[in-house]
Structures are given as C-alpha cells and as structure tokens.
Amino acid sequence: MSVSMRLSRGGSKKRPYYKIVVSNSRAPRDGKYLEQVGTYNPLLAKDDENRVRLIEDRVRYWIGVGAQPTDRVARMLDKAGIKERAATNNPQKAEPGKKAKERAEERAEKAREAAEAAAAAAAAPAEEAAAEAPAEAAAEEQTEA
C-alpha cells in the first residue's frame, strides 16, 4: 500500500479549509484517511502562526515509514523545517515556444531592414547636398561679380 501525505479539503463553498492527512494514495482526496497530522487554513494571513499547524512527531514518523508528501505539503514541511525539499530546476520553462521565436526573428529582420533603409535615406540627402552645394556656390560667385 502506497501512503501519501496530502491535503483533504473541508470548509464551505469559497471558504476552503484543509486537513493535512496521511492516506492510501488510491483513496479519494476527501475520503477515508489513516491519520490527520495537521491543518492548513489559506484564508489566514501568510505570517499567521495558525495558517499551517503540524503535529511534528507524527509527521516525522510517517515520513520515516515512507509516506510521500505531495508538492504542496512538501513546501509546508520545508518551511516548518521538518523535511528539506529539493529545489526544482526547469530552465526550458522560460524559453519561448517555436511561434514566439519565429515572431521575434521576423521583428528583428524588419527592424534591420528599417535601419538599413534609414541609413540609406540619410546617406542619399548628404550626397545630394554635396552635389548641389558647388552649383549654388558657383551661382553665388556669378551674382557677386
């Protein structure tokens, strides 16, 4: 029999209250359990001491026997200093998907083309101004003479 330590929901609609229980992993979430080892009230403030209450010696016993805490319960146990939770590392989670990468490449390509066009436009008037300047200077010399 695989034993898990998990949350069993109680309370009324929109007012959750959880028991931290040890139960057969195949039993329903709110069904029969072997032992209640704590409570969790998410409606209380995060710094409230009654938000998570654990019976530490029973929790340690069940972990020693082989009960597997769920992720949420493991976080609570880690915060209480009962069982250290291994940090998870998923660097691919932050990586954008294929379509997002394609859109980013298209945007970068459009920006490059716009920069090239702006550089070409800036270079063209400078050449025209250089070409027109001697003609204007010659015209000014003729009017002065």
Swiss-Prot record:
GO terms for biological process: translation. The keyword Glycoprotein does not apply. InterPro entries: Ribosomal_bS16 (IPR000307), Ribosomal_bS16_dom_sf (IPR023803). Residues 82-145 are annotated as: Disordered. Keywords: Ribonucleoprotein, Ribosomal protein. Residues 116-137 have a biased composition (Low complexity). Pfam families: Ribosomal_S16. One of its GO terms (cellular component) is small ribosomal subunit. It comes from the Bacteria. Residues 95-115 have a biased composition (Basic and acidic residues). The keyword Ribonucleoprotein applies. GO terms for molecular function: structural constituent of ribosome. SUPFAM superfamilies: Ribosomal protein S16 (SSF54565). Belongs to the bacterial ribosomal protein bS16 family. PANTHER family: 30S RIBOSOMAL PROTEIN S16 (PTHR12919), SMALL RIBOSOMAL SUBUNIT PROTEIN BS16M (PTHR12919:SF20). This is Small ribosomal subunit protein bS16. It comes from Novosphingobium aromaticivorans (strain ATCC 700278 / DSM 12444 / CCUG 56034 / CIP 105152 / NBRC 16084 / F199). The lineage of its organism: Bacteria, Pseudomonadati, Pseudomonadota, Alphaproteobacteria, Sphingomonadales.
